[in-house]
């Protein structure tokens, strides 16, 4: 919501070198700004990402309903919602639900095109692919997978069909490419830095952002095994906010898809076309996911491959349906798997209800909060000390203070009377230390001229940057806190010491 906030404040979509994320395509962020401006509340953005997620679920369900029984449709929806991180996406002002909806639409259109033909469907696929990339760069895997699907389906017409689909996709993405080129010097900012360059960026930040060289291949033989079994490993090890996979996709969404192969001969003639299409779209995206995970430390994160979710949901639901037609003897595999699936979904639903009941977001989002459930109390429940710390900045440092964040990338709730400099790449410390060769004391004292205070996310610094296995530059990061405390004094901290506000020593 940082860019929508700035967009509403200035009325202009300009470059912000202090935060590279604002250089990404901003289709959904503009919709957030439109909703917030229309209703006068930033919580109105919830209508956008909630609506996008609902549209995606309806598209998955509607596609399956055309080719399979109704209960198959409902199972696909349940498998998606069984992932804790997925349903949390409905509650967050982020772009993943839009990517999911566009991916579901692309799969639906591809299924229709493969069964009925028609150049108009190619135009629609290009439109959806271009929109998806204009929402999030990683949706480029969807565009590539659609191209592969067109090639496999009609190889003799691939040039003609490819030109139609790719031409439409590029035309739809063109405004964002031009914006990147004009404002940032890079049509795909901040990627491809070696080719295009880009303001506020350099080779070190490019390597650090993608965690180049820290992929699964760097883990030796065990990493190769994890790479081959990536969907299963991401399911087993994926937790919300985790380091390597960073997503809870649910127990069965991806693993259950294997059953469609085991029970292929038991699918009906109506079910096979959608299963083939889902598999055809999924395989190239899986290959790209594995390639990213092999070479990059963040490439294996499930949150980056949201376009695979509609295909996985359809294949898993169809595979489960095929199991119902397996022989019951000598062992009723279908009964066993059904019990396990039901148990997992019920447990997930219970956890969801508990979380929603505890957070109680409805009244706040709709502007109907109570004295016991105000906006401030809701934000404290959902963001913890982060919101409290930011609200203290003007009281502790004074109006007009310039605050540099350390190891804290989020600054949306920064008071209007304070200028906040978020640590978007968490490299306010590391970048000058590693790339400029500056001494620790020199870095801190160099802040004196343009910084009045520092907001230090000490809990994240200590638990993640100093202790988390696999996080690089632990020794260099460990130099920060002592250097900070030599020149600045603690003015405020929350009860748990998670966030601290520092000011200069006299």
Regions found by a protein language model. Give the residues of each.
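Transmembrane alpha-helix segments characteristic
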Residues: 74-80, 124-129, 145-146, 170, ...
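Membrane-proximal, lumen/periplasm-facing interface regions of secretory-pathway glyco-
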Residues: 1-2, 337-392, 410-411
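Transmembrane-helix signature of polytopic, membrane-embedded enzymes
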Residues: 43-44, 60-84, 115
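Extracytoplasmic
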Residues: 394-449, 462-486, 493-494
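Hydrophobic, aromatic-rich transmembrane alpha-helices
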Residues: 55, 60-61, 226-276
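Membrane-interface transmembrane helices that cradle and orient dolichyl/undecaprenyl
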Residues: 65, 106-122
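Signature aromatic-anchored transmembrane alpha helix within multi-pass, membrane-resident enzymes
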Residues: 120-127, 143-147, 163-170, 314, ...
